Amino acid sequence: MAAPQCHALVHRVLAECPVTKARACEFRLPHGPVKTPVFMPVGTQGTMKGVTADQLRNLGCEICLGNTYHLGMRPGPEIMKKAGGLHGFMNWGRNLLTDSGGFQMVSLVELSKVTEEGVQFRSPYDGKEILLTPEKSIEIQNALGSDIMMQLDDVVSSTITGPRVEEAMHRSIRWLDRCIAANSNPDRQNLFAIIQGGLDAELRRKCLQEMTKRDVPGFAIGGLSGGEEKDHFWRMVTLSTDHLPRDKPRYLMGVGYATDLVVCVALGCDMFDCVFPTRTARFGSALVPWGSLQLKNKQFAKDFQPIDKNCDCPTCQRYSRAYINALFKSDTAAMHHITIHNIAYQLNLMRSVRDSILQGRFPQFVQDFMRTMYSSRDKYPQWAVDALETVGITLQ
């Protein structure tokens, strides 16, 4: 067991919803404060697709996510060190979270073989064999200089059952200890543990019991959002938040749909990330409080309203739906404008959620959000109805 460390993260709970498990917190990191609940946009190779660091800053983003697997391959840790870490490389003066590279074990499974030592990859760039160990993952993340680093965990698809899930859970605990020992900057870089256990409540409980014994500054709920039934998903989320310490951040990995964000805040989660808002923008889909608009469709060719008249993002302040629709015929700028809007939508949604918690009206916020998103009670997803019921919100 590692000795207690001096962490670079100071966490405060500012308000808790008296009905649900929702909470508004603030934690201070080396590159400034982060107010939660928070959505973190994802930049795979040190940049948001179609958005500059300045634009992200202007949207009020306090923390974004970089991918260790891709950045470790190209441009690589040596170049990162010379650039002054990932902050210097992408000219980003705010906070960064880097993942461990473990998720690619699922998404690039044909490239990988898992042993106790680590994950054997064939590089998609040059075909070379690479062994990503817990130590190597932390070495790369130390070179990147991220404010929050994730442990390397043994990731299996959330739809898999049986002995492989138990093996992955126990291995993730052992790998956490190796990651803690390998972190050369604990006073500047915060290492988060990742709770595994698949959809097996007993395994997840065991993992929670073991990992919460470790002196780490925060915890992530991993191994979900991979195609499992939503009914299983929310039950594993609530089981996890029930057993995680109150005084540390709780990060639900890979969640980005608006309804999922609101429900999982009610279940006690603080931090979220997902490629969804940027990926869906590339297909012409703009996020709005009542769902999404497919701006490529010809119905928008003569629609001179902004995407959302209540949105204060640069896209909605300057351009019409018709203009963006026209851009799709000849220009990639359409995707850029929608990406800006979609990131702003996610950040604004989480600010509204937070304000409602601070003002003691979160349950009413949830009622209003669901009514706007789905127009009628019979369209509410049953999993969301059931999940909210368990934390004291009966949807009207």
UniProtKB/Swiss-Prot annotation:
The keyword Mitochondrion applies. Keywords: Cytoplasm, Glycosyltransferase, Membrane, Metal-binding, Mitochondrion, Mitochondrion outer membrane, Transferase, tRNA processing, Zinc. It is an enzyme of class 2 (transferase). Its cofactor is Zn(2+). One of its GO terms (cellular component) is mitochondrial outer membrane. The active site is at D99 (proton acceptor), D273 (nucleophile). GO terms for molecular function: metal ion binding; protein heterodimerization activity; protein homodimerization activity; tRNA-guanosine(34) queuine transglycosylase activity. The keyword Glycosyltransferase applies. Coiled coil: none annotated. It catalyses: guanosine(34) in tRNA + queuine = queuosine(34) in tRNA + guanine. Its EC number is 2.4.2.64. Queuine binds at D99, S100, G101, G102, F103, D153, Q196, G223. Zn(2+) binds at C311, C313, C316, H341. Residues 254-260, 278-282 are annotated as: RNA binding. Belongs to the queuine tRNA-ribosyltransferase family. Catalytic subunit of the queuine tRNA-ribosyltransferase (TGT) that catalyzes the base-exchange of a guanine (G) residue with queuine (Q) at position 34 (anticodon wobble position) in tRNAs with GU(N) anticodons (tRNA-Asp, -Asn, -His and -Tyr), resulting in the hypermodified nucleoside queuosine (7-(((4,5-cis-dihydroxy-2-cyclopenten-1-yl)amino)methyl)-7-deazaguanosine). Catalysis occurs through a double-displacement mechanism. The nucleophile active site attacks the C1' of nucleotide 34 to detach the guanine base from the RNA, forming a covalent enzyme-RNA intermediate. HAMAP family: Q_tRNA_Tgt. This is Queuine tRNA-ribosyltransferase catalytic subunit 1.
